[in-house]
Amino acid sequence: MGAAIIWIAIRHSNFPFTVRIARFILDSCGHGGVDMFLFLSSFGLYYAYRKESDYVSFMKRRLIRVLPYSMPMCLILFLFGKRTVSEFLIDFFGLSIFLRNNWTYWYTSFILFMYFLTPLYLKVFNKNPGRSTLCGIALVSVICYLLPSYQYVYIYFRIVIFLLGFYFAYLNEYHRDFKCWPLIPVMCFGWYLMYYYYHHFGNDIPHILPFVFIIPGLVILLAWIIDKVRIIQKPLDFIGIYTYQFYLIHEDLFAKLLERWSDWYRPGIHFDFFINLQGIVMAFIAAIIYKKIIDYIIELLKNRTKRA
C-alpha cells in the first residue's frame, strides 16, 4: 500500500522529471498506483471474508475504515468553499461513480461499492474461482462497452483489477506452488502496450487496459524486492497505515501549495522539486494528524456507548 500511494502522489504532483523513462513510469503512468491499491485491497478482502463471512459484520468493519474519515473531509471542503452543494452531497453519500461529479473522491465511492459486492461475489467465486473470474471480467467488459461515457469506463473497468486480486489471493492460499515467473513477460507486454498509448496519445494516458497485464506481475516483483531489501519495508508499512487519509487530503493541499508559491516565484527545476516534495511531506503529516484525531473521536464515542 505504501508504494502504491507514493506512486499516486507523484502522479498528482508536478515533479520536473528530466529523464523520459522516469517521467513515463512515475508520472504518465502514475494512475497505476490506484490499480495497485485496488489489487491489494481485494487481495486482503479475500482473507478478511474468509475470517468473517457474516455480511453485516463484514460490512461494519469495512465501513468503519472509510466513512469516519471521508465524511468529515467532505464537510470541511464544503465549508471552505471547495465543493458546491451538489458535489458535497454526492461525495458525502459515496455516489460519485453513479452520478457525474468532479471525480475527486471517486475512489471512496468505488471502494464502498466493491465492499457491498464482495461478499456476494465471493460466495459465487468460492464454487469455481477460475470460471467466476473469467465470467466477471467478461461481464465487466460488456458493461463498459455499453457505457455512454468514457469517464465511466475509466472507473468501472477497474473492477477487473479488483477481481484479479481475489483470484491471486485464492492462488496464494490453495496453490502456493504457483509459478510467478510467467507474470514477468505478461507485465512487460503491458508496459509495451502502455508505451504504445504514451507514444501515440501523449503524456496524459487515459487508458486502464494495460494495467490488467502490468499490476499482478508488478505487485509480485515489488513484494520480492521489499522482502530482500528489508530496510524499506518498515517505512512503507508505516506509510501504508495512512494511505486513505493521504488520499483524502493530498490533491487539495497540493493545489493550494502550488498556487501560493507560484505567486512568489517563477518555477524552476530545483524549485519545482522542492515544492512538490514539500507538498507530499506536508500531506503525509496532515494525514497522520487527521487519522489520529478521528481515531480519538471514535474511541471517545465507543467509551461513551459502553458506559451508557
Could you tell me what each predicted segment is?
Residues 4, 27-38, 47-100, 114, ...:
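Transmembrane alpha-helical segments and their boundary/interface "anchor" motifs
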Residues 4-11, 132-145, 185-190:
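Small-polar-interrupted transmembrane alpha-helices in polytopic inner-membrane proteins
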Residues 6-17, 82:
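Alpha-helical transmembrane segments of multi-pass membrane proteins
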Residues 12, 41-48, 75-79, 116, ...:
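Hydrophobic membrane-targeting alpha-helices
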Residues 17-24, 86-95, 199-203, 260-268:
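Membrane-interface helix termini and inter-helical loops of multi-pass transporters
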Residues 36-38, 44-47, 66, 70, ...:
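Hydrophobic alpha-helical segments with transmembrane-like composition
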Residues 146-148, 155-163, 170-247, 251-279:
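Alpha-helical transmembrane segments and terminal signal-anchor/GPI-anchor hydrophobic tails
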Residues 294-308:
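Membrane-proximal cytoplasmic C-terminal regulatory module of class A 7TM GPCRs
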